[in-house]
Amino acid sequence: LSPSMKIFSGNSNRQLAEKICNYLDVDLGKLNISQFSDGELSIAFDENIRNENVFIIQSTNPPAENILELMLILDAAKRASAKTVTIVIPYFGYGRQDRKDRPRVPISSRVILDMTVGLGADRIVSMDLHSSQIQGFVNVPFDHLYSRMALFDELKKMNFDEETGVVLAPDVGSAKMSQAYAKSLGISFALIDKRRPKANQAVVANLVGDLKSKKVLIIDDMIDTAGTICNAADAAMDNGAISVTAIATHPVLSGPAVDRLMNSKIDKVIVCDTIEITDDKIFDKLEVISVA
């Protein structure tokens, strides 16, 4: 570990930052984040970072305030003469808005990355991007990490085999990620053709694959409102599955997600700690694996 490395955390996921520092056997840097009476953020590094290699850890959920906080921390680091600044974004908010899918809309993920690079980020690190092609939006190194390595030990304990196990992709977008899990586990692969009548609403159109008498593993990059993954679980059980386990890297868990998951046909929900989970979103089926 370089002696010139310093790690700092925003407010979004300090627990993960502390775990990373414990793993690396370094102290988490001193960064003061407070608010003025009108709600404006006040950012100040409480230690010298001149000529240091600075890493800033900040997930962006909820996105608006945490993205602004990240940009202000980045600007403060550059103005404090850090040698390099690496932005570590375990969960990249606005990652789903990666193209113009209808007239008169922004490409929001490009806007966020333009701000990040414009303020001087030297490198960006993120995990299980919803759309990996957004790496091409910037001309600085953009490292795309995968949670699969952290989750694989847990999956091995579940004894999936070629005869009884199948990985089910809940939509076409998650097919590549699901196929990687299926290959690693040596089990078969199935796919759901999902349609979206409107935002945050998904319906199952078709299911391709044999799920009869199988233990089903549903893989996705995130659980937002949980509609997609719960519909996939219903489809799996309707097609003869004997159990359903859901795995997602990012526990966004917005709106009705927790209630849906608690009352779903899913036996276990495994997520990572890329987003800090508040106490009101903890439920019996939930298991959290650290990616630190």
Segments (PLM) and residue ranges:
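PRPP-associated nucleotide enzymes
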Residues: L1-A292
